[in-house]
């Protein structure tokens, strides 16, 4: 199964926090695809983040001490909280 970024979906970072993907942008210099996202775990933090798509989707070592979720990828689709987030938006 191919791992692709889905705009408008909630993702969980391997350290446990949740983020909403707002868009995918193109770096004007390198032409690299960039994921545009914001945190939803802290409603007072409205800072937009940008990370290259390759890194956003990269596999990580599930045995890393800071990988509290044990997940395979840096960011994974968070189906478990998406409905709650949409209802409480």
Which residue ranges define each predicted feature?
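Mixed-charge, low-complexity intrinsically disordered regions
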Residues: 1-89
